[in-house]
Amino acid sequence: MTDEHLLHGSCHCGAVRLTLPSAPEKATKCNCSLCRRLCGLWAYYEFGTVRIEGHPENTAEYIWGDKTLRNVRCKTCGCVTHWEPLAPEPGGKHGVNLNNFDPRLQESVQVRRFDGADTWTFID
């Protein structure tokens, strides 16, 4: 993927903007009780490598379950932009919702289906 503008995404209203360090090779579509409601398509990056503008001033968070990560959404339009660990560790990951990026970026990514509702394994 050489088209640099494809690495820039935002929520619907533009208050939260994300820039990826590189195009992802893979993304995950999870069917857990939260991800299936969010319609998230998650690409993973080392925490701190994705530039996120408008966070935290324009975002709200949702923390649930084992309380190890926060799901982040725009306070204005409600789009979920990413999730991040509550206690980041060196080399730790966070997930970016590719649905906030140009659809051509998604077309270039292998999507893996993850059974977060039951077996916690990939099902593809």
Which residues are covered by each model-predicted region?
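A short Gly-Trp-Pro
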Residues: 1-10, 15-124
